[in-house]
């Protein structure tokens, strides 16, 4: 806490009181924003955990089935089966606003029938490969949601840190400095007022003393 280097005048004190009022109001608004950001961030983190588990389970199932398929199928047939993908996908990217933070929204679309996920005929492939392809397809949506969630959490964390720095600056530096300076100016003004009153009383005493002396002289002459 440090006092601002300004002239201790009533005008400056009035100006500082206005700044203090603005800073206090800004601190409350930023504190409310920080609380809401933290709430949104924690909700995204919880959703992130759920999506990660969902994606990991789907991928785990896909990998296990793929390993079995690779064991029971020849490498030639397996490579041929996966060489030409039959279904095409696209991802549209947009944004949504959370407390003045633009976070991404990923929209996953398939251009063919969702059920048409097998890029091969069924004559020379195993059921495990079908299960693996289905599991990989099922994992796409939670993986995309997971990427969206993690990026949103990252952006909110950055905004939280920036807002927290501003709250701390107001709370620990600016507002205390304004208060300290206002107290200092009030003290100096009070000192000046006391000094001015003392001077006036001294002048009054001198005037009275001089008047009494003049009266005594006049009385002696009479």
Swiss-Prot record:
Keyword terms of this UniProt record: ATP synthesis, Hydrogen ion transport, Ion transport, Transport
Transport listed as a keyword: yes
Top-rank lineage group of the source organism: Bacteria
Family recorded in the similarity comment: Belongs to the V-ATPase D subunit family.
InterPro entries to which the protein is assigned, alphabetical: V_ATPase_D
GO biological process: proton motive force-driven plasma membrane ATP synthesis
Pfam families: ATP-synt_D
Organism ancestry: Bacteria, Bacillati, Bacillota, Clostridia, Peptostreptococcales
Protein name as catalogued: V-type ATP synthase subunit D
Function description: Produces ATP from ADP in the presence of a proton gradient across the membrane.
HAMAP family, alphabetized: ATP_synth_D_arch
Keyword Transport: yes
GO molecular function per UniProt: ATP binding; proton-transporting ATP synthase activity, rotational mechanism; proton-transporting ATPase activity, rotational mechanism
